[in-house]
């Protein structure tokens, strides 16, 4: 940071490690070359290995002390296969790792580096090309000839459910209830985002403020392994899990009925607010660059996801949302995952 550049580890969602550099463009390539050189010359010391192992174990063993909502997301990642191993499995594996194991893995890693560079800013294209060549020379040959992405073996089966009940040391109960659409679709994801913006204030007011079901009551849209997903989160110290699930289901069906009476103008105003967010001029180059990170990580080198999202949103009508809500919750065209 002293040179005007922040360097941060930046792992992606597919099992790859990267480094994110933000700051003065003219200094970044020099720092990147130095970083790569140090990575390739890195010597793992036994005492550093022992300290790192202890820190990792402390972090893993403290997960059970996290708040209920945090632990819900840990277990949610397991049933949705975005996380491969349980905390217990990670702890057991970490305990077994030896100094020799880490040295071997380091050698395997450095011999299989696939280099992928995303540069956004005041760069001459030839400068980036020359950096790629110099970085490849520093790293040397690689056994990895394509960009590796770890894609979970996950499919959505309509009408099915995955449920996991976990006992923890914290007082109270929590529920994370996900409704996963069976088709990968950017358009559906955008429509779910719009539906959630219309639903979330009512969900909070009804379950948190009026019924006082829980001290946390929120809904959000996301993607589960690229499948559009609508989720409800409740944490309570005065309600049991069965009642929480019933409250969520009751709210959903009341929302479906109420949505028909929602004025078209409310949908259009919400659309406009979301479009205004998308069209907002980024505050700085870092924010501007970050909007394309997901495309880069997924190998979409057209970098057009944001533009497509705006087009989908502009073309969405209230009837489209009504059709999706009915398909989701009346026809039951979803898979339910619950922790």
What are these language model-derived features?
Residues 1-41, 50-96, 112-121, 172-193, ...:
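M16 family metallopeptidases and their MPP-like homologs
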Residues 101-103, 158-164, 215-221, 322:
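Glycine-rich, charged/polar anion/phosphate-binding loops
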Residues 131-145:
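Glycine-centered hinge/linker elements that transmit conformational signals in sensory
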